[in-house]
Design a protein with these regions (language model features):
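Short N-terminal mixed-charge amphipathic segments
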Residues: 1-56
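Generic structural signal for short, solvent-exposed loop/turn connectors between secondary structure elements
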Residues: 19, 37-40, 61, 175-180
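Short runs of predominantly hydrophobic/aromatic residues within well-ordered alpha helices
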Residues: 20-27, 44-45, 62, 66, ...
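A broadly used, surface-exposed interaction patch
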Residues: 37-39, 46-51, 56-90
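C-terminal charged interaction modules
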Residues: 70-190
Length: 190
């Protein structure tokens, strides 16, 4: 068992370095491609692959490289990844968008780690960032998630939550993902 933070992945017996020491910014850029609904899945994979690895052109097995990248992003072993893929509930409500919500996540993670993760030149490994993110307690970010969760489940908001929602609706509402085809239909004279 390796107890260290991963800085490389092994693909077909050869080690390949993750760009910038697997800094959270590299991973969030990859996640951003997956959140971009204007890209098809193959393009999302390709863009993330090119971003994640320090020397992606030296990798000959792109499918395995993408799988290994997703293992690192999801912070899982291969067995956990396979089990999660088989059990994943596609109907679970989406509660966050890393790109939209980063301005709320970064201060909360920084509070846990004791330094500002946005400091230029300071590397924070993705797993360190993710571990701190999982430890976030009461803060504005957790309030946003709580409100989104209640709304997604059709639960009634408390009065103080309704007040926050009215005041910060733009921050709390997630972008609606519609396809180009749906946009075209909405803009037509139907």
């Amino acid at each position: 068992m390796n107890w260290d933070l991963p800085l490389t992945v092994t693909i077909d017996g050869k080690e390949h370095e993750i760009d910038n020491g697997c800094d959270y910014r590299v991973v969030l850029n990859c996640i951003g491609f997956y959140e971009d609904t204007s890209l098809d899945l193959q393009t999302q994979h390709q863009a993330a692959f090119m971003t994640f690895y320090k020397d992606p052109l030296s990798i000959t097995n792109a499918n395995e490289a993408i799988k290994q990248m997703l293992l690192i992003i999801d912070c899982k072993t291969e067995a956990e990844f396979e089990q999660n893929s088989a059990e994943q509930n596609q109907n679970s409500p989406r509660l966050m968008n890393w790109t939209k919500d980063f301005k709320f996540i970064a201060p909360a993670v920084s509070r846990i780690l004791g330094y500002d993760v946005r400091t230029p030149g300071r590397c924070t490994h993705w797993w360190t960032f993710l571990g701190a993110w999982q430890e976030i307690g009461e803060c504005f970010w957790s309030t946003i998630i709580s409100i989104r969760n209640k709304m997604a489940k059709g639960q009634k908001l408390e009065e103080w939550e309704r007040k926050i929602y009215r005041e910060r609706k733009k921050d709390i509402d997630l972008p609606i993902n519609i396809t180009d085809e749906e946009k075209e239909w909405l803009n037509s004279d139907w």
